[in-house]
Structure formats: structure tokens, C-alpha cells
Amino acid sequence: MEYLTHSLIAKSEARQIVNKLKAEKLSWQDGKKTAGSHASEKKSNFQLDKNSKLSIKLRDIIVNKIISNPLLKSFTLPSLIHGVMFTQSLAGHHYGSHIDNPYMPSGRSDLSFTLFLNAPEDYEGGELCIQTINKTEKIKLSAGEMIIYPSTQLHSVAEVKDGERHVCVGWIQSYVQNNEDRNFLFGLDAGAKGLLAKHGRSDELDLIFQAYSNILRRLGD
């Protein structure tokens, strides 16, 4: 499984978002409302109403941060970032093993992301657990850091034992649906840009960029 962790926002900005979320008293809903039929009984958390003014404002900030980041754009090749929501998990809350719906009302889920908004020492437990063939990856990042991983993977959120866990989650519909194809293009793009930075433009490098663009045309939606 290929996944990417990256610092999306500063810790100070993440702290400001958490403070705004804590000040919002009336717009929190039971997280079961947005879970698929197979996952609703496994889910316990609170989610900010997607239609609230605060949710819309914060969602736009996060989406703009993602699409303006060259590394994230290269890794995800996003055609649509959708379903973005803010969640709060208190002591006893968890989300059992599940897989994200392939098609949601807002779009197709090729990649999933979790942006951690508060510091790992603020809560005990609450790790994002991504299952692979041989092991389970347990992810708990610093405030402002995010993980992007294939939506094809089974995953869960460990029970929060103490404190509060605040995250932003969402999904990415990519121009290239297949994970292996997307990872191949990411490596090709990273290598070409590295050569450009180290050696400057050349006719040979132009051929690599041409190949990348034409492969993307062939593989893309």
C-alpha cells in the first residue's frame, strides 16, 4: 500500500481551527448519519453539520490548501475533493473496521485523507489503523499533518481512551482511478522535476515530460 503523509497547515492554524470547532455548540451531529449501511453500527463520533457556516468556511480552506500544494497534486491528481467533514471523538468513541463507499453522492472515492487537527498528546488512543496483507499500520500524526491513502483499504479508528480527537476527513476523486497507475505517474513526475531542478531544461527532459503528459491522457478519466 502506498500512502503519503504531509504537513498541510501550521500547528498554530490547526489550533485555531480546533478552538473554532470547540466554540461551535449547535451544529454537531451523530456520526452514524454519514456512515454506509455496513459501517453505521461500528461508528461512534460527532460530525460538524456539513451545511453549517463554519463547516463550509473551514472546508474551503482545507480544499484550497490541498489543491495549491504541488506535492499533493502530483500524488493524487485530483479531479474532485469531496465529502470533507470535521469530526470530534470523545472518550469511548471509535470506528470499527470498514471500507469507504466506492461511490458517494458527492463523487467517487479513489483516495481517502485524514488531517489531524490537535496534538497526539491531547488524547490517548484514536489511531487511524490501515490494514494491509501482513500488518496494520497505526497512524497518529502531529497537528496540521495529514495522511492520504487508497480508499480500497480496510481501516478503522481505535477507541479514544481519554481526551478529545479532532480531525478533518475527506475523499479525492482522481483523474487516474487505478492506484498503481497513479503511483507510477507520481514517480515519473517526481523524477523529471528532480532532474529539472538539478540540471535545468534539456531536450531529453522535454521528452520525459511529453511521455508523462501522454500517459496521463491515456490513463485518465
Swiss-Prot record:
EC main group: oxidoreductase
Cofactors, names only: Fe(2+); L-ascorbate
One record GO biological process: DNA damage response
A single MF term (Gene Ontology): L-ascorbic acid binding
Annotated residues for binding of 2-oxoglutarate: R165
Coiled coil: none
Sites where the protein binds Fe cation: H98, D100, H155
This enzyme's EC code(s): 1.14.11.-
Co-factor: note: Binds 1 Fe(2+) ion per subunit.
Keyword Cell inner membrane recorded: no
Domain Fe2OG dioxygenase: 80-174
SMART domains reported in the protein's UniProt record: P4Hc
Keywords, in A-Z order: Dioxygenase, Iron, Metal-binding, Oxidoreductase, Vitamin C
Record-given protein name: PKHD-type hydroxylase PMN2A_0775
Organism the protein comes from: Prochlorococcus marinus (strain NATL2A)
